[in-house]
């Protein structure tokens, strides 16, 4: 046996010393470098037909944010389907998911690869991968020795998943494989602000409280709302979305509460309002601060008594709806200014959540970049998509005034630009593919808060402000349409716009 008892005991001790799951996982991975003398390793969690990295060593930081769908990565699929150690020959025709993801060596190909599927009660829960640059790097380790390492990793991961379910008071992981769970987008981030937010989401999801989600544009408030809904007892009922900022005053009441036939000119049939659609489920009211005071009063009544009146109907209708509201405005100040009802504010903000801007969680930029790189790779049908070290450094230094949404758009746009000069299907993103200008010395506004200058991409500066604004809107709409394969409804949803308003804007900009 090549692996000594002392070496295995060292791993066991390291796993016990970790203060958190993340710390334990990283200690395990770090120990593998000494134990197996590997150049790269990763501990992966299996969920919904994909592998999610939990800890890595020797790989680019953005790997932690990537999500490896089995159907896109045949080596990982082979590991998932195997019941034992998998050794890939150096000349294997199956592409390695980590090719191009070795820091500062983007063109380096992995030569030796071993995969260990991890099981708990005969259910696949994850995988351990070890890689090396020498084709014979792991030949002197027997399958039995590697199984021992895999068993220790499986025990650590299984215990962590069990504790996670107990802390969140979730049922067994059968639910995680449901179609509804597959559609839930993940809240990516390991920074302290995001860990705190995730804990708060877990806490409030199990209740039936109304939640006010606050944060700047582009931070992911809708993502938080979805996480709350899918972690609640209402998860099997509808989550209905309404952007209050896109509601014309003339139809806002009908959108919220519905109307009966003949209620007003043009009401040629009955219409079900968003509250009825969300009965027994959740209603997400985005940009709640844009509602008129008149509608705020009617919304308050529904929240207080659970009954509503359709426009043109004298009878009341009982509904059971949980309301999640979001805003990028300071509603406390709006209350003081008389623009928002104090009683509605207190009714909505029973459990307020604040979503941190990206500049306050810069640790997550690399993870998010990897997440969006993998998504862009899949959407554009690329074999490989990676960031150079210089591009990664640029992304981490940029201030991201548009937050996560701006980062997503920047990655996708850079991928489209870089792909234009490639024929192999393997794309490497460098700084030249990003229109990002790092801020120079900040100036200070009269409030004393720093205001960065020279942060506007150079291609926005030519022409007048209207022309630059139109050009920016045109680019964003076109990129979003490409991502959604020309689906205007999906495009409008991502851009948080009313579908009709989007069509009108697209016509004015010459897109339609």
Swiss-Prot record:
Residue ranges of DNA binding: 488-507
Associated pathway: Nitrogen metabolism; nitric oxide reduction
Protein name: Anaerobic nitric oxide reductase transcription regulator NorR
GO molecular function: ATP binding; ATP hydrolysis activity; DNA binding; DNA-binding transcription factor activity
Bridged cysteine pairs (disulfide): none
Matches recorded under Gene3D superfamilies: 1.10.8.60, 3.30.450.40, Homeodomain-like, P-loop containing nucleotide triphosphate hydrolases
Residues with the 4-aspartylphosphate modification: 57
HAMAP family in alphabetical order: NorR (MF_01314)
UniProt function note: Required for the expression of anaerobic nitric oxide (NO) reductase, acts as a transcriptional activator for at least the norVW operon. Activation also requires sigma-54.
GO term, biological process aspect, one: phosphorelay signal transduction system
Residues the record lists as binding ATP: 215-222, 278-287
Keyword field: ATP-binding, DNA-binding, Nucleotide-binding, Phosphoprotein, Transcription, Transcription regulation
